């Protein structure tokens, strides 16, 4: 990244930015090839909560090196698990019991220190001088502690899932206004794109009612597959909740949903091709969105 930005920024008038996103990865298969797996029985018991802590350890190394620091593993945050890291007493007690057995303790500990995952001597990156003003960092995490922590080092924007509830989105904006690193300037609502599935039907030969019904059917099938992939089971309640976040319908319906649900300053990241391998249809949907939905939304906002 430093090399790329050094070359990219050779032109002093260059304004195009490099946007780099990083996250822990939602699925196990993303992390396993890189050795991010439980190393002990304690880590295995704590794994759902521990993965987020590993992300913060790795993020600190990544960001401090980008900042130009000389660091070693002794300078990186330590991972200490307590009850606060777990959703229930039962989950925490399982980890405590694993620690008692693994470490031959006489009683359940109140805190469990996890050895550093990344052990290294003094390290820095070169080149040290590059156009950091052309770098935009985005963390894919919904954890408020992680969002706050990474911004103690460098300006890091955040990213939300298409199924994130409006309440969580608004709370994130409020928090980021307080914790966003000052070197990044004032936090703006557009700094966190609002991700949304778009199930738009503007197909020829259908009435507006038929387009609406077809879009609903496409959305139900796709969102059911999405939750099945995430959790291994289809939960109708969660499918309905995801549908409430998605944009579904004909041109007029999608435009109306955007105006009613979204803040006027939101930046929309529209996801068109989920569960749809018909490239021509995807392109038609994208064209209809830009040529018909967007102008309609703009006119509705102007008249509001």
Could you describe each region identified by the protein language model?
Residues 1-29:
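A generic, well-ordered mixed alpha/beta core segment in the N-terminal half of proteins
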Residues 4-9, 54, 289-298:
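Alpha-helix-loop-beta-strand connector modules within alpha/beta enzyme cores
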Residues 16-22, 135-140, 156-161, 190-197, ...:
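Hydrophobic faces of well-ordered beta-strands that scaffold small-molecule active sites
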Residues 24-28, 70, 143, 163-165, ...:
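Active-site-proximal loop/turn and secondary-structure-junction residues that shape catalytic pockets
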Residues 30-36:
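Short acidic, glycine/serine/threonine-rich loops at helix termini
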Residues 40-128, 165-267, 300-301:
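An alpha-helical appendage that flanks or caps ligand/catalytic pockets
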Residues 113-169:
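Loop-centered beta-sheet repeat module
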Residues 249-303:
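Long, low-complexity C-terminal extensions of enzymes
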């Amino acid at each position: 990244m430093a090399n790329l930005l050094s070359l990219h920024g050779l032109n002093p008038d260059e304004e195009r930015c490099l946007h780099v996103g990083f996250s822990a990865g939602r699925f196990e298969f993303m992390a396993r090839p890189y050795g991010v797996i439980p190393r002990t029985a304690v880590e295995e018991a704590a794994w759902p909560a521990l993965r987020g802590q590993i992300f913060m350890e790795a993020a600190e190394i990544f960001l401090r090196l980008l900042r130009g620091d000389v660091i070693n593993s002794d300078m990186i945050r330590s991972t200490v698990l307590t009850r606060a890291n777990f959703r229930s007493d039962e989950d925490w007690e399982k980890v405590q019991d694993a620690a008692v057995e693994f470490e031959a303790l006489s009683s359940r500990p109140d805190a469990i220190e996890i050895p550093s995952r990344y052990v290294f001597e003094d390290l820095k990156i070169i080149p040290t001088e590059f156009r950091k003003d052309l770098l935009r960092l985005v963390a894919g995490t919904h954890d408020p502690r992680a969002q706050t922590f990474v911004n103690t080092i460098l300006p890091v924007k955040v990213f939300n899932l298409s199924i994130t509830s409006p309440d969580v989105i608004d709370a994130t904006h409020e928090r980021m206004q307080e914790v966003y690193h000052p070197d990044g300037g004032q936090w703006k609502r557009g700094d966190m794109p609002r991700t949304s599935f778009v199930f738009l039907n503007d197909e020829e030969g259908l009435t507006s009612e038929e387009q609406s019904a077809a879009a609903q059917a496409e959305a139900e099938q796709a969102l059911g597959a999405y939750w099945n992939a995430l959790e291994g089971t289809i939960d109708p309640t969660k499918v309905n909740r995801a549908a409430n976040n998605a944009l579904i319908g004909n041109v007029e319906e999608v435009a109306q949903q955007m105006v009613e649900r979204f803040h006027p300053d939101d930046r929309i990241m529209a996801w068109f091709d989920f569960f749809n391998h018909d490239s021509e249809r995807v392109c038609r949907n994208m064209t209809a969105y830009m040529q018909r939905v967007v102008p309609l939304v703009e006119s509705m906002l102007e008249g509001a």
